[in-house]
UniProtKB/Swiss-Prot annotation:
UniProt entry tagged with the keyword Transcription regulation: yes
Subcellular location: Nucleus
Keyword check for Transcription: yes
DNA-binding region: 112-208
Main subcellular location of this protein, as a coarse class: nucleus
Top-rank lineage group of the source organism: Eukaryota
Family matches, as PROSITE patterns: FORK_HEAD_1, FORK_HEAD_2, FORK_HEAD_3
Organism of origin: Homo sapiens
MF GO annotations: cis-regulatory region sequence-specific DNA binding; DNA-binding transcription factor activity; DNA-binding transcription factor activity, RNA polymerase II-specific; sequence-specific double-stranded DNA binding
Alphabetically ordered keywords of this record: DNA-binding, Nucleus, Transcription, Transcription regulation
Pfam families per record: Forkhead
Residues annotated as signal peptide: none
Stated name of the protein: Forkhead box protein N2
Length: 431
């Protein structure tokens, strides 16, 4: 479309584009803010007569006082404030705030309680001695403490039943067969969702109708809340104490293992059991175990032979000597010989301690002797013990290296014997 030419000023004012252009031109000419605001008003008021401008209210009073609510009074005529807490049937009976209860003479007995149905059920169950009620007793408790429901429509009972069956905060408890308490099942509060109900009860105001009854006073409700808080705090304290005890026991055990000496009954135990019969002359049976075991009762593991020490040794020694776990005794036993006899060929490596060895009565049965260390506690200082442990560790490592080399030599010899025997058998079969 081309530009509109030949239009009258009245018609230009009726069109929106012309109205905007005219308003902007007037604002540009005037320059001041109040005049610009007046000029930016719709042209429909300017087209009318001057009497229409006189009927408009002057807005200068807005700048005189910033508090616009001083002349207004908030009374009971205002709309009720809807609480943000809703339950499953909250649309039928909304919960209101304290603005509805400023006239207790008029609305004391007939006013709606500020609690949702879930909170009403919770208060009824908590008020009972057994903390569980059937549906009929919940109805009667609500009617006794909130007279509003006596004249209310009967739909509130359906709301109570729906909350009991659909709300996760409540759970059904079956009646015991031995007791005859009537028909139906009992309802109680789920302990998992109990803190949520307590928190919702804190946010709700106390109504004047409920405060008239002594059993449902604000003091009673606050006492119920405090009791539940104390229970929750006790449970949390018990959990925290148990966790701290576990942490402390683990830390103390670590400290005891590193700093405190071992008791007298603890012993160094090594596995020294070997096979005493071989079906093949080249078979070698080796059973290895950890070098140290700090087990008090030697019956816990039947593969370990108990050997007690009379002296207390630091756990640091056991941790360092655990490096010598390769220190084991290896024995090579031929086919036509018994363990411990004169014809047996074997290599023995024992722990070198700073005491004399005693005769082992189990030496003929294939067990290597493990002497008991007899060290006087008073005559030796800590430095001597450290030096002795270092020397023993070095000797144990040397013996372990020698035993490993000896074992490697035995295995190579056995491998060569087996290979030659196989080749001879193959040659005989070919012939």
């Amino acid at each position: 479309m081309g530009p509109v030419i030949g239009m009258t000023p009245d018609k230009r004012a009726e069109t929106p584009g012309a109205e905007k252009i005219a308003g902007l031109s007037q604002i540009y000419k005037m320059g001041s803010l109040p005049e610009a605001v007046d000029a930016a008003r719709p042209k429909a008021t300017l087209v009318d007569s001057e009497s229409a401008d006189d009927e408009l209210t002057n807005l200068n009073w807005l700048h005189e006082s910033t508090n616009l609510l001083t002349n207004f009074s908030l009374g009971s005529e205002g709309l009720p404030i809807v609480s943000p807490l809703y339950d499953i049937e909250g649309d039928d009976v909304p919960s209101f705030g304290p603005a509805c209860y400023q006239n207790p003479e008029k609305k004391s007995a007939t006013s709606k309680p500020p609690y949702s149905f879930s909170l009403l059920i919770y208060m009824a169950i908590e008020h009972s001695p057994n903390k569980c009620l059937p549906v009929k007793e919940i109805y009667s408790w609500i009617l006794d403490h909130f007279p509003y429901f006596a004249t209310a429509p009967t739909g509130w009972k359906n709301s109570v039943r729906h909350n009991l069956s659909l709300n996760k905060c409540f759970q059904k408890v079956e009646r015991s067969h031995g007791k005859v308490n009537g028909k139906g099942s009992l309802w109680c509060v789920d302990p998992e969702y109990k803190p949520n109900l307590i928190q919702a009860l804190k946010k709700q105001p106390f109504s004047s109708a409920s405060s008239q009854n002594g059993s449902l006073s604000p003091h009673y409700l606050s006492s119920v809340i405090k009791q539940n808080q104390v229970r929750n705090l006790k449970e949390s304290d018990i959990d925290a104490a148990a966790a701290m005890m576990l942490l402390n026991t683990s830390i103390e055990q670590g400290i005891l293992e590193c700093e405190k000496p071992l008791p007298l009954k603890t012993a160094l135990q090594k596995k020294r059991s070997y096979g005493n019969a071989f079906h093949h002359p080249s078979a070698v049976r080796l059973q290895e175990s950890d070098s140290l075991a700090t087990s008090i009762d030697p019956k816990e593991d039947h593969n370990y032979s108990a050997s007690s020490m009379a002296a207390q040794r630091c756990a640091s020694r056991s941790s360092v000597s655990s490096l010598s776990s390769v220190d084991e005794v290896y024995e090579f036993i031929p086919k036509n010989s018994h363990v411990g006899s004169d014809g047996s060929e074997g290599f023995h490596s024992e722990e070198d301690t700073d005491v004399d060895y005693e005769d082992d009565p189990l030496g003929d049965s294939g067990y290597a002797s493990q002497p008991c260390a007899k060290i006087s506690e008073k005559g030796q200082s800590g430095k001597k013990m450290r030096k002795q442990t270092c020397q023993e560790i070095d000797e144990e490592l040397k013996e372990a290296a020698g035993s490993l080399l000896h074992l490697a030599g035995i295995r190579t010899c056995l491998g060569s014997l087996i290979s030659t025997a196989k080749t001879q058998n193959q040659k005989q079969r070919k012939k």
